[in-house]
Regions:
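C-terminus-biased signal that marks the final domain/tail of proteins
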Residues: 1-214
Length: 214
C-alpha cells in the first residue's frame, strides 16, 4: 500500500484503479507506504527494475484499455468539470494513448462545493466523445444506460459499453462533507439509495444515533 498527501489547493480522484506512480520514500510528511512495497513486488515478479524506477500502480495494478476506459475515464470526467486543460487527456481516457497519463491531482478553478460533487457522481460523460446519451445505444430517448457486458463482440467486431460514474446497478451512494469551522458532530453524510443519477440525497449528521422515521 501507499498513501500520498493531496495539496490543500488540489483535488484527487480514484475509480477502482490505482493511480499513484512514483513513491516519495524520503518525504514522510507527504507520503506513507508499506515497508515491503518494493520487495514484495519483486518477490511476486511484478517489478524487477531499480528502486528509483518503481511505480506502485504499474507494479500492482497495470493499466490496459479496459481499466483506463472503465475506471480512469471516470476520474477524467470529474477532473474536466472542475479543472482547466483536461481535454488534453481525452485520448488517454478513451484508452487510445496509454502514455498520456493524467496527473494524480489537479488544481480546481474554484473551491469545490458539495453540489459540484453531487453532479459529478451523476455523470454519464455528457458533452464528451463518450457521451452515453448520444451514441446508438441511447435509442430515441437519449437513454444513458447500458446493460452488461462492458465489452462485447458482434460479427467479429468488438464494441464497448461505457462504464459511467452513475450506473443503474448502484445500491447506495454518498458524499461526506467535513466543515472545520463547526464541531465534529456537525459533519454531514449526504446519503442516497440506488442510482445516483435518479435518486435524491438525504443529509445525515455524523452524530446521529438512530434512524428517524420518515
Amino acid at each position: 500500500w501507499v498513501a500520498m498527501r493531496i495539496p490543500d489547493n488540489a483535488i484527487s480522484a480514484h475509480a477502482n484503479q490505482a493511480r499513484i506512480q512514483q513513491i516519495k520514500f524520503n518525504d514522510p510528511d507527504n507520503c506513507l507506504y508499506a515497508p515491503d512495497v518494493i520487495s514484495f513486488a519483486r518477490e511476486k515478479g511484478y517489478f524487477n527494475g531499480p528502486d528509483e524506477e518503481f511505480s506502485f500502480c504499474d507494479a500492482y495494478a497495470p493499466a490496459d484499455f479496459g481499466t483506463v476506459r472503465g475506471c480512469d475515464a471516470r476520474v477524467w470526467a470529474f477532473f474536466r468539470t472542475v479543472a482547466d486543460d483536461m481535454d488534453q487527456y481525452t485520448d488517454y481516457a478513451m484508452g487510445y494513448n496509454m502514455s498520456n497519463r493524467m496527473p494524480l491531482w489537479v488544481k480546481p478553478r474554484t473551491k469545490v462545493d458539495p453540489k459540484t460533487v453531487f453532479d459529478a457522481m451523476r455523470d454519464h460523460y455528457e458533452g464528451t466523445p463518450m457521451d452515453m446519451t448520444q451514441d446508438i445505444g441511447a435509442g430515441g430517448h437519449a437513454l444513458p444506460y447500458r446493460w452488461r457486458p462492458m465489452e462485447f463482440e458482434v460479427d467479429g467486431v468488438s464494441y464497448v459499453n461505457e462504464r459511467a460514474t452513475a450506473t443503474q446497478q448502484t445500491g447506495f451512494w454518498f458524499v461526506a462533507q467535513a466543515r472545520p469551522w463547526l464541531p465534529d458532530d456537525m459533519g454531514i453524510l449526504w446519503f442516497g439509495v440506488d442510482d445516483a443519477a435518479t435518486s435524491c440525497l438525504t443529509p445525515i449528521y455524523c452524530s446521529a444515533t438512530e434512524v428517524p422515521e420518515c
